[in-house]
Amino acid sequence: GYIVESYGKGYSSYINMLVSVDKDFIVKKISILHHAETPGLGDEIEKDYFLKRFENKSIENLVVIKGDTADKVEAISGATISSRAVTEDGARNGVKMLKEKLSGEGKEQHGPHS
């Protein structure tokens, strides 16, 4: 598997995180490293109940939904911006960048011949 450090722009701060994925780029775990989101609302992003919503999600399913959802990520009530910052800006974009970087692994860069 792989771990990528990523971030998203939350309601009142940037949210720094680590995203752990398996070899197929399925999320295994997200850890919040730093944030300054609103106490009692946005700071819920670091709680287990929210972080567990990411387990076994593919890039395509890293989308925030308001209300119940089985395959996407349910937003924290009252903290949709923070939820999107973690899910879409941080996790999805981080995994996407990792996948793109690794797919180019081993390819040689050819420049103009002199």
Regions of interest found by a model, annotated:
Residues 1-114:
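Flexible, solvent-exposed loop/hinge segments and secondary-structure transition points
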